[in-house]
């Protein structure tokens, strides 16, 4: 996909000129000039779009097309309005099978041109994204290949930033959408190594079962023991500032989750290929950071395995010793994500991080609580919470803070081990899962993102979303600017 900027939009710049207009303001100068050339055509068309979101097409204007979209009154043109208009425009362009367009939307009142440009590009790229295709007979495909923006105040720098973000999001989505027979723990490791070969500032180490055993990662090994696919611990570094403490992102990389002996229902089990979306987001963020050349140190740690059923699979009631030395009684084999994360979070201690954020499709309970709009997050660190909230607001990648009160820890008590891996009832499932993780994060500042509701769209049109890559990149940009 090609994105560009122009100061002088015209009809012949692309297949379609898209013009957003206000109901209470005159046309901008460039549109007035085009209107005069076309004998008042634009003003006539504007009369046919009285309400926000109304559109009108005019084809064969000097061999090109013109799309007018009503944006309402200037005072009411908000970030939410922008999102709606961009969505309507993108869907219209794709439906009409245009390959190129010049988009001229008004400036927002409260946001910078740089921010607006990033949001438009991220949204257009999300909507034009096409699933990986394994069909043997291909329908003739069509893509929107080029969009040029007219947005006074936007710069080439902001354009390049937006392109880096969508590159990271696309990489995340491609990995998450991959079928589990292809995207195995080994494949994830290979993708991380591939990134290190693409960028000089990235290095990578991928560890297998023997190294994992030597480090005492009993929880990760327990989850993996039911599968023929060997587990992987992926340790990938982006070296952007050798003098600063690293930020660490820990990703859950369960490439397929049957639930183990606590087996999941058959309905929609195919979507459990998305249980490695946390790992995919970590790799997507690292790729974007390398493209942006952010002056930070960033480490991605991914604990990857399959959670399957076999004669050697871990059983309910088994007790394992984690890398931290703490013991866990496995009450539910379908609460496996927190087990692999426990060892990965302990592994993170060696780097003396500034802070750690884990990203995981961890609980169905967070979907019950928040649906697919906001990612649930938990932390005890108020400064980190403020940073996450700020980044979420700026990136439009929504979050909602959930409690992490000490009283919830009681649900994890075990008569036989230091803790159980899941509560005996279904109450506060996302909170008690975070409480479990908190027991492995006492040596650094930490936050947990539960993306089970936001990492993919379920059903017939199932598709990875690429979240929370935009949120995390925005957070890291603030970290970079503070150093």
UniProtKB/Swiss-Prot annotation:
A Pfam family it matches: Peptidase_M17
A cellular component annotation (GO) from this entry: cytoplasm
GO biological process terms held by the UniProt record: proteolysis
UniProt binding sites for Mn(2+) 1: 257, 334, 336
Keywords: Aminopeptidase, Cytoplasm, Hydrolase, Manganese, Metal-binding, Protease
Cofactor note: Binds 2 manganese ions per subunit.
Cysteines joined through disulfide linkages: none
PANTHER family: CYTOSOL AMINOPEPTIDASE, LEUCINE AMINOPEPTIDASE-RELATED
Record protein name field: Probable cytosol aminopeptidase
Organism: Legionella pneumophila (strain Lens)
Gene, per the UniProt record: pepA
């Amino acid at each position: 996909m090609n994105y560009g900027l122009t100061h002088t939009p015209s009809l012949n710049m692309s297949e379609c000129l898209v013009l957003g207009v206000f109901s209470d303001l005159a046309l901008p100068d460039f549109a007035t000039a085009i209107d005069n050339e076309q004998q008042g055509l634009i003003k006539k068309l504007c009369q046919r779009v009285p309400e926000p979101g109304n559109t009108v097409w005019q084809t064969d204007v000097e061999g090109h097309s013109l799309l007018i979209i009503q944006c309402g009154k200037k005072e009411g043109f908000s970030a939410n309005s922008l999102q709606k208009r961009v969505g309507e425009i993108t869907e219209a362009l794709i439906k009409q099978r245009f390959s190129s367009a010049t988009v001229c939307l008004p400036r927002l009142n409260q946001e910078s041109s740089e921010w607006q440009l990033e949001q438009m590009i991220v949204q257009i790229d999300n909507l034009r994204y096409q699933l990986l295709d394994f069909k043997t007979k291909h329908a003739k495909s069509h893509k929107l290949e080029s969009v040029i923006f007219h947005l006074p105040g936007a710069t080439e720098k902001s354009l390049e930033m937006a392109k880096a973000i969508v590159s990271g999001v696309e990489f995340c989505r491609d990995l998450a959408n991959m079928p589990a027979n292809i995207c195995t723990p080994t494949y994830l490791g290979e993708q991380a190594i591939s990134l290190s070969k693409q960028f000089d500032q990235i290095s990578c180490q991928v560890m297998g079962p023997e190294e994992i055993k030597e480090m005492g990662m009993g929880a990760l090994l327990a989850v993996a023991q039911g599968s023929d696919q060997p587990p992987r611990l992926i340790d990938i570094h982006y070296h952007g500032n050798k003098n600063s403490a690293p930020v660490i992102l820990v990703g859950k990389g369960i490439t397929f989750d049957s639930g183990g002996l606590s087996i999941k229902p058959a309905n929609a089990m195919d979507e459990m290929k998305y249980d490695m979306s946390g790992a995919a987001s970590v790799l997507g963020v690292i790729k974007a950071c390398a493209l942006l050349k952010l002056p930070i140190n960033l480490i991605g740690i991914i604990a990857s395995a399959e959670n399957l059923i076999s004669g050697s699979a871990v059983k309910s009631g088994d007790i394992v010793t984690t890398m931290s030395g703490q013991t866990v009684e496995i009450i539910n084999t379908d609460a496996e994500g927190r087990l692999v994360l426990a060892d990965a979070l302990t592994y993170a201690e060696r780097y003396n991080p500034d802070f750690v954020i884990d990203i995981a499709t961890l609980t169905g309970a967070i979907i019950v609580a928040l649906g697919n709009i906001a990612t649930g997050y938990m932390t005890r660190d108020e400064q980190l919470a403020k940073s996450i909230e700020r980044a979420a607001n700026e990136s439009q990648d929504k979050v909602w803070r959930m409690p992490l009160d000490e009283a919830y820890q009681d649900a994890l008590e075990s008569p036989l081990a230091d803790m159980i891996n899941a509560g005996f009832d279904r109450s506060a499932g996302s909170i008690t899962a975070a409480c479990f993780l908190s027991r492995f994060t006492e040596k650094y500042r930490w936050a947990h993102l539960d993306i089970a509701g936001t990492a993919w769209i379920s059903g017939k049109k199932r598709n990875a979303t690429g979240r929370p890559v935009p949120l995390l990149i925005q957070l890291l940009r603030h970290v970079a600017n503070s150093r």
